[in-house]
Amino acid sequence: MKDFPVFPTDFGVSSIILREVPYRREAYIHIQDVQPEHVSAHLSECVSFCRMVGAETVLVREHPALDGYPLHTSVVEMRGSAWVDPALLRNVFPVTEQTVGQWRRICNERMACVDNAATLEEKDENRILKSGGAYFVHDRGELLGIGWLEDTKLLAVAAVKKGAGQEVMHTLMSLVEGADMNLEVASTNERAIRLYEKLGFLKTGELFRWYRAYPVADRDL
């Protein structure tokens, strides 16, 4: 679905991201140029458009005039040193042209309910391959999970087997052992945050917030 980098109303201008509507039924608004007193009226028109094209949830990125709107999630940065427990080290296989489709489907399935995680489309497969940082993690032929690294930044990680998160992470960290790693995670992804903290990662700052523009109950405002 087409995004709108510039979406003007009588009250200002925003960008509207619709690419997740077919998958998550979510739309995203980035306020560009709106006076604080006009934010509510501007968002009302943006939300109406998003709902018209099928969005059931509309989120708006952080803006000074959004304090009265309910917080959906915040995105925080975490940093830590890559270290490896040899007892948890498993086999890692890079994604190839033959397996990138499978990797992408697994990633989408595991991230479907994770806030701030983008759905990967078929057109993204070339980018995944060119990055050279997408992997499968196996143990004696059993798929444990997947991961995606960009240098020392963790772009994505997902366990396929229940309880395999530490094994997947230690195996991925073995690829950059000793380096300082960083990642971004939604505050609502509490299970992932607990895992990262167990591995020694610390929150180093809040990057931005998503507020809920629709649905919004009267009591929320």
Predicted stretch roles:
Residues I31-N91, L207-R212:
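Acyl-donor-binding surface of acyltransferase catalytic domains
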Residues H63-S74, Q166, T188-E206, V216:
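Conserved active-site alpha-helix within GNAT-family acetyltransferase domains
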Residues Y28-V39, T152-G165, V185-A186:
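A short, internal acetyl-CoA/4′-phosphopantetheine-binding micro-motif in the GNAT/acyltransferase core
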Residues P86-A118:
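Short amphipathic alpha-helix that is part of the acyltransferase structural core
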